[in-house]
Amino acid sequence: MEELPFRVFVGVDWGDELHQVCSVLGGKPQQRRFEHSGKGIAALVSWLMELCERQPATVAIAIERPHGVLIDALLEHGFAVFSINPKQLDRFRDRFSVAGAKDDSRDALVLASSLRTDPQAFRRVEPEDPLIIQLREISRAHRNLERDHRRLCNQLRDQLNRFFPQVLELSNAADEPWVWSLLERFPSPEKVRHAHQSSLERILREHRISRVTALEALEILKSPPLPVAEGVVEAATQHIALLLPRLCLVNDQRRQCGQHMDRLVKKLGETEDAQPGTKREHRDVEILLSQPGVGGIVAATVLAEAHQPLVQRNYHVLRTCGGIAPVTRQSGKTRNVTMRYACNHRLRQAFHWWGNAVCQCDPKAHALYLEHRRMNHSHARALRAVMDRRLNILMACLRSGHLYERDHAPKKGLDNT
């Protein structure tokens, strides 16, 4: 972006209902406002076409959000769209108001002017594969369902601790479907007192549980109950009766979401570019899945949240977006290296899972982890060091186009360049 081939610079302050747009052509700003609707976006595109005399390639548009309906419409009509981190935009805003004044028209002007004067702070937004868009939505929905599942399980566990802790001896987290079936059939110690061994055998058989027998489970459940105040058991069982259907629903949706992610990853792996000689995305999927420690959820999250760095083979952007690269603050003789907090938190969580898994299945990764732990580094910091190495290896594999082989790991590209 050293020499921008653009004549018109436009800033868009995005809104749920209205978009404030400022264009800078020849140093003179023009402000317009458009509704967030089909008619409003069409009017915005028409206005931009008039400004550039039907040459959309000469228009550069700055906006905070890298995704959305407005961005898709602008890209579809051939405009160049650039995104910026909101924190960086806040710093640029100080140029126009020392007092910190802020409004929509000023933000649109700041975006347009900053893109013209400081293009290196912006990142160009490229059109995305429809499969990547679907995968991103499904992977984010899966993460939300995981959070809901954990929250509901914690609520169930709290209720069981009040009056029926024997169930937690069978499943400490209370997150297994067979435990929910058990509670539907026997919701209280009073009900368990009249339970038969055959009833528990049926539940265990339906859910294929073999680590505990029906006799052992019955013995645990029939142990002396907690002495509780009158009404506690009734209140807790009613609360659990409300939780169980929600837990079953969220668990089914989570399973369906995971299956959908697997299908999308497989479909993406089978996709070939139409133009001969270009890199095929399905090869990238194969290479990613060949890395030790990478499972379906991690692969889907990395492909969805870090698609551009993977396509561009940009190791530095990938480690920065995932929170692996540290932040160094140095002034005079003082030097402080800290964890990076400004990153894609979904991608960072995926890298954390990947790091945990690779330490269990790869001896070299485990040795590197232990080396950092011996230096009194925390578990998370040691995992970031492991993942820094893994991302470098991943990029080397992507550049060479070869699958990862543990005994013949590629050496080219491991110089952090």
Model-based region annotation:
Residues 1-417:
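A detector of single, family-specific signature residues
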